[in-house]
């Protein structure tokens, strides 16, 4: 009998999450309401930030954060190309220019030195990425940003539970976390913006809901007049309480979820040692890795096959994979606008990286199945 297909990711949803959704559905208040408020308060406390704003996606959060910081035509925003395309898309849609920097070949994260070389008088923001669950080296970055007076937005989409030198990432400034279906904590779709800047938090909160000073639940609970005024034109990026209810349960489980991810990643590192596949390196500064993804680099000279053949080989054995990510500057729209941009280490990884299964409900037997399949492809097992 053939084994069931093993996806590269699967959300860990149990009876508690289902009960939480049912409670909201029966409450009569299913859109933004008390669950959002509780989620914001608890997430801010978990991270160590003064303010948190829940939104419907990290893309929407990035959009209104950039807008709230005044990013617009003529401005430049520095970010690695080795990230999801939504960051550059939001920069571009505001009329600003994404300035792509290269990454370290083995961690897939950039650093303060590469960023400093890209700073110009037009630079208005820097967006570092905590990649695959690892923490970006923040101290040199914030020293650089303070020196030049440039805003920092930490892209923490992969980093719920990640810590840097004992502090949760995002607690030093402004950050955006994703609750997408494959993330360490999920609510299907959703995000959290965190900051210690009250004025920035207030503007993000306003922009996420039409530019109004209040939402429907705010009016209900505080008795404000229903004729809310537009302070400035905004968007519709609020999170429904159905989603927030799931996220609240996931937040309670997050440390346990990440502990299991760490167990699995540790097994992978041990059992894949000696094979020609190349896992990402763990940065050598103090941090707590959340292991959002387990990424291999499949180099044809080392492995005897390219990434596409490797992924096809795992697919034929009933194992799913992913690519995180094709470098942004290689996408058609961005390549047309910067045809000569060369980022060698980004491009080397973009052509070779492959995410293999890693999710908290995986069993040790699932992991051994993946390792065995890789050994088979590498000629180490019949």
Swiss-Prot record:
GO cellular component: membrane
Gene Ontology BP annotations: lipid A biosynthetic process; lipopolysaccharide biosynthetic process; response to antibiotic
Protein family: Belongs to the DegT/DnrJ/EryC1 family. ArnB subfamily.
Enzyme Commission number(s): 2.6.1.87
Protein name in the entry: UDP-4-amino-4-deoxy-L-arabinose--oxoglutarate aminotransferase
Subunit relationships: Homodimer.
Record PTM N6-(pyridoxal phosphate)lysine, positions in chain: 183
CDD domains in the record: AHBA_syn (cd00616)
HAMAP family the UniProt entry points to: ArnB_transfer
SUPFAM superfamilies, per database record: PLP-dependent transferases
Keyword annotations: Aminotransferase, Antibiotic resistance, Lipid A biosynthesis, Lipid biosynthesis, Lipid metabolism, Lipopolysaccharide biosynthesis, Pyridoxal phosphate, Transferase
Top EC class of this enzyme: transferase
Segments crossing the lipid bilayer: none
Pfam families recorded: DegT_DnrJ_EryC1
Entry keyword annotation includes Lipid biosynthesis: yes
Summary of the function given for this chain in its UniProt record: Catalyzes the conversion of UDP-4-keto-arabinose (UDP-Ara4O) to UDP-4-amino-4-deoxy-L-arabinose (UDP-L-Ara4N). The modified arabinose is attached to lipid A and is required for resistance to polymyxin and cationic antimicrobial peptides.
Pathway the protein contributes to: Nucleotide-sugar biosynthesis; UDP-4-deoxy-4-formamido-beta-L-arabinose biosynthesis; UDP-4-deoxy-4-formamido-beta-L-arabinose from UDP-alpha-D-glucuronate: step 2/3; Bacterial outer membrane biogenesis; lipopolysaccharide biosynthesis
């Amino acid at each position: 009998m053939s084994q069931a297909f093993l996806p590269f990711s699967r959300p860990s949803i149990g009876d508690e999450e289902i009960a939480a959704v049912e409670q909201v559905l029966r409450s009569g208040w299913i859109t933004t309401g008390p669950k959002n408020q509780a989620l914001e308060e608890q997430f801010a406390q978990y991270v160590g930030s003064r303010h948190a704003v829940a939104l419907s996606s990290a893309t929407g959060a990035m959009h209104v954060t950039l807008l709230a910081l005044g990013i617009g035509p003529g401005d430049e925003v520095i970010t690695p190309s080795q990230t999801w395309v939504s960051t550059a898309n939001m920069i571009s849609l505001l009329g600003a220019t994404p300035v792509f920097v290269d990454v370290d070949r083995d961690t897939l994260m950039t650093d303060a030195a590469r960023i400093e070389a890209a700073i110009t008088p037009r630079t208005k923001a820097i967006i570092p990425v905590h990649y695959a669950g690892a923490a970006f080296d923040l101290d040199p970055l914030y020293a650089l940003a303070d020196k030049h007076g440039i805003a920092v937005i930490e892209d923490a989409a992969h980093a719920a539970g990640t810590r840097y030198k004992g502090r949760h990432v995002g607690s030093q400034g402004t950050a955006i976390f994703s609750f997408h279906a494959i993330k360490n904590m999920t609510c299907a779709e959703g995000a959290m913006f965190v900051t210690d800047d009250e004025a920035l938090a207030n503007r993000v909160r306003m922009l996420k809901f039409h530019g109004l000073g209040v939402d429907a639940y705010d009016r209900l609970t505080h008795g404000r007049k229903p004729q809310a005024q537009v302070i400035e034109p905004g968007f519709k990026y609020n999170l429904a309480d159905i989603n927030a209810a799931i996220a609240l349960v996931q937040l309670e489980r997050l440390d346990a979820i990440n502990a299991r991810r760490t167990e699995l990643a540790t097994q992978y590192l041990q059992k894949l040692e000696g094979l020609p596949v190349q896992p990402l390196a763990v940065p050598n500064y103090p941090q707590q890795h959340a292991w959002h993804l387990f990424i291999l680099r499949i180099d044809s000279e080392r492995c005897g096959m390219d990434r596409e053949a490797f992924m096809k080989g795992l697919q034929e054995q009933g194992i799913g994979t992913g690519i995180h990510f094709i470098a942004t500057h290689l996408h058609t729209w961005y390549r047309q606008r910067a045809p000569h941009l060369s980022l060698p280490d980004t491009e080397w990884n973009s052509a070779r990286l492959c995410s293999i299964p890693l999710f908290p409900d995986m069993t040790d037997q699932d992991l051994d199945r993946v390792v065995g399949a890789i050994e088979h492809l590498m000629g180490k097992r019949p």
